[in-house]
């Protein structure tokens, strides 16, 4: 139940609120008054009164504070300042909860965790050795207001999902600052004083929310099982039973320790292929994927969430049509998978034939095993040769298959479009024959080579770009410093990490890839008042990406000068003097620094084969209180669910804007609810404000694709790029993804569509079932042809 606060009061005196003087209510009001001293737009009396209405007869101060936290959260949609109040109340509760378990300081917190079998010996010894210095570091950071940087929902996410808990009492044994310093200490190089300085640098970045590692690192750094990698990519099992079942085992072990899985299945023979050992015929990939589906669901990620995997299939595989039906809600359940994510690994030849309205041939890998390991011109030649030799199992119009792929995307959001040739063509790891990227990962931002003996691994972290806007400018030097520290510790994960399989450990030690990403791009544009799809925004996005790559490469070169280049250095394109931007016709903003970097790389090499990848950042962006990765905002008003009810959160930048205009009032708030968070119909606010605060549904998707393409030269891996269409159609989708391919994108992620519901209804408790957006049930050939042949005028991209 969500507490509904009463109308605001002008005063906060107990006698004016009906609160008993001297009772727990008066104590609560005093606390609220103190916490809101610098929050003039909040009303502590209103929050206190709401909390008292919801209390039980025996309520103590802690229960009243919890009720007040809920009441303040219920007012966030009226004023974002209530998020700060709710966070401050929750901070008090978390601090008391941890203290109740003995965690009264950072060193005490680690000691409790170690005693209960949560903290690794190595981390506990490091903290014990430097206890006084580390405790003082936390106290100093708290004095600077570190805890006050959290919004309510970010802090609630930390408390519910990330803070270590006592195995018996289930109470937290660390505060948010203890948690962040524990993560940093888990990455200490050794026990030296210099290591303490490095740890302090990372901790300061995290406490300022300038940078956050990905969730597996936050979950596990410093613990007894430090599995800190986010992504694992596995090559397709070989076309034999032992290999298929060995992959099940590998996936289960990786998933158990919170890794997201990307897995190719393109080597397995198609349905109807001869099995020579039994003189029978294969049932194809679907039964094996059904087993994988059940396994992924059964093995949860450290007890925190279900396992997750994405299966990639090359577009020439003869089981592609059945693959497209795996997530359907109708049909034989034995041929459906309800947990696996699906992705297409699309060669350029297929897209060219779609454009030309030519035929496309489907093969069984048993007949053309070489196709999986070829890309570019070599793939094209081998594919055409197989056609000429009559090896195809089926030939069909390429547009028919493409249309079915688009329909699956429209209906399920699945069947992500990722591009094999673009991914391999510029990949730093594919310099030599035989090293091939066979798929991306669960979130389509990782591009790394795999084979039967190597499972690709990536350690992720994200820079909060919004934190570097200072007085209307980007603080480029502080951004450089942040990237250098982030890369140092991402590289450290390679050495400290726990690897669930031998194949993963072998690959990561050889290639040492990391994935530094970004979040809060939308925050940058709001702060600088740039519409998301404006030329200025695109130019700044590209410039930020270039600077992050430049600083990351410099940091990797620093590491190579100290520790030597990666073991597989000679197998990289960079070792041949080709940096990732060299593959693109792009003008550099800092050519002198790039030239100096090239000279250093030629002399010392680099410590990492790959450095940049933009991941989705859903949870860490929530912790940091910024918008996800490189995405536009989805709404100016959105729902947050908690165990005690649903709350609405409003765009704080918009509220400040409307306050300055004098129109942030009850009428505007109600209009925002009725419009599901859109301000486009608000004629009473200036047009430039409406343009600035458009949502992802109101921004032409061509703008998102162009921005993604512009930053691609400065991403040596890839980016999780969601696309948004309120009512997807075959025509819109076919043009949109053809345009993405032509612009050279390596991957795309989910297609987001939106059910026709009102936020106001959802939050009021009278929500009706969401009506699905209308979806095409058959491919409209005319619409498909029109959109493909006229991509410049397609409505989806304008």
Please report, for each region that a protein language model flagged, where it lies by residue:
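Extended catalytic cores of very large enzyme megasubunits
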Residues: 1-798
């Amino acid at each position: 139940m969500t507490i509904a606060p009463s109308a605001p009061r002008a005063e906060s005196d107990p006698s004016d609120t009906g609160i008993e003087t001297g009772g727990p209510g008066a104590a609560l009001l005093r606390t609220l008054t103190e916490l809101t001293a610098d929050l003039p737009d909040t009303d502590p009396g209103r929050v206190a009164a709401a909390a008292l209405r919801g209390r039980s007869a025996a309520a103590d101060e802690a229960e009243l504070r919890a009720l007040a936290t809920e009441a303040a959260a219920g007012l966030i949609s009226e004023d974002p300042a209530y998020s700060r109040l709710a966070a401050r109340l929750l901070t008090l509760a978390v601090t008391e909860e941890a203290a109740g378990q003995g965690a009264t300081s950072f060193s005490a917190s680690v000691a409790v965790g170690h005693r209960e079998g949560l903290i690794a010996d190595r981390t506990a010894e490091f903290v014990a050795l430097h206890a006084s210095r580390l405790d003082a570091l936390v106290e100093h950071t708290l004095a600077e207001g570190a805890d006050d940087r959290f919004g309510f929902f970010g802090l609630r996410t930390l408390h519910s999902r990330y803070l270590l808990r006592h195995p018996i009492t289930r109470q937290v044994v660390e505060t948010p600052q203890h948690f962040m310093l524990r993560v940093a200490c888990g990455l200490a190089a050794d026990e030296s004083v210099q290591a303490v300085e490095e740890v302090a640098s990372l901790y300061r970045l995290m406490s300022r929310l300038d940078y956050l590692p990905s969730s597996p690192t936050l979950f596990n750094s410093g613990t007894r099982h430090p599995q800190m990698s986010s992504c694992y990519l596995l090559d397709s099992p070989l076309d034999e039973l032992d290999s298929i079942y060995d992959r099940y085992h590998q996936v289960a072990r990786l998933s158990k320790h919170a890794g997201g899985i990307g897995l190719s299945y393109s080597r397995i023979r198609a349905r109807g292929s001869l099995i020579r050992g039994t003189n029978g015929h294969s049932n194809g990939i679907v039964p094996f994927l059904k087993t994988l589906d059940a396994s992924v669901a059964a093995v949860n990620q450290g007890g925190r969430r279900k396992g997750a995997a994405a299966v990639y299939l090359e577009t020439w595989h003869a089981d592609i049509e059945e693959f497209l039906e795996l997530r359907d809600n109708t049909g034989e359940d034995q041929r459906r998978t309800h947990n696996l994510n699906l992705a297409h690994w699309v060669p350029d030849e297929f897209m060219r034939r779609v454009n030309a309205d030519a035929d496309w041939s489907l093969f069984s890998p048993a007949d053309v095993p070489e196709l999986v390991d070829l890309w570019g011109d070599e793939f094209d030649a081998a594919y055409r040769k197989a056609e000429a030799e009559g090896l195809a199992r089926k030939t069909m119009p390429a547009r028919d298959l493409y249309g079915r792929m688009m329909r699956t995307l429209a209906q399920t959001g699945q069947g992500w479009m990722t591009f094999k040739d673009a991914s391999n063509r510029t990949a730093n790891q594919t310099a030599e024959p035989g090293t091939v990227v066979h798929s991306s990962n669960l979130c389509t931002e990782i591009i790394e080579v795999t084979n039967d003996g190597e499972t690709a691994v990536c350690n992720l972290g994200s820079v909060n770009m919004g934190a570097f806007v200072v007085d209307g400018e980007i603080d480029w030097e502080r951004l450089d410093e942040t990237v250098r520290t982030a890369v140092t510790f991402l590289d450290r994960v390679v050495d400290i990490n726990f690897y669930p399989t031998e194949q993963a450990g072998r690959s990561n030690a050889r290639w040492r890839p990391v994935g530094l990403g970004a979040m809060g791009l939308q925050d940058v544009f709001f702060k600088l008042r740039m519409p998301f799809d404006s030329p200025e925004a695109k130019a700044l996005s590209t410039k930020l990406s270039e600077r992050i790559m430049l600083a990351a490469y410099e940091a990797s070169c620093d590491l190579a000068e100290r520790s030597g280049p990666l073991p597989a250095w000679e197998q990289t394109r960079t070792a041949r003097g080709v940096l990732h931007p060299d593959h693109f016709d792009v003008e550099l903003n800092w050519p002198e620094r790039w030239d100096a970097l090239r000279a250093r790389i030629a002399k010392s090499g680099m410590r990492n084969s790959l450095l940049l990848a933009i991941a989705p950042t859903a949870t860490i962006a929530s912790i940091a209180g910024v918008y996800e990765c490189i995405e536009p905002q989805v709404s100016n008003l959105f729902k947050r669910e908690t165990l005690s009810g649903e709350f609405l959160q409003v765009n704080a930048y918009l509220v400040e804007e409307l306050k300055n205009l004098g129109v942030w009032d009850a009428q505007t708030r109600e209009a925002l609810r009725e419009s599901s968070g859109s301000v486009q119909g608000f004629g009473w606010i200036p047009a430039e404000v409406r343009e600035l605060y458009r949502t992802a549904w109101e921004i032409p998707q061509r703008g998102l694709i162009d921005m993604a393409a512009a930053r691609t030269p400065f991403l040596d891996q890839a980016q999780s790029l969601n696309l948004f269409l309120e009512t997807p159609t075959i025509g819109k989708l076919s043009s949109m993804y053809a345009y993405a391919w032509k612009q050279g994108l390596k991957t795309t992620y989910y297609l987001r569509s939106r059910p026709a519901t009102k936020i106001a209804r959802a939050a009021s408790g009278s929500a009706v079932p969401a009506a699905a957006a209308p979806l095409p049930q058959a491919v409209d050939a005319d619409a498909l042809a029109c959109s493909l042949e006229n991509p410049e005028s397609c409505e989806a991209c304008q």
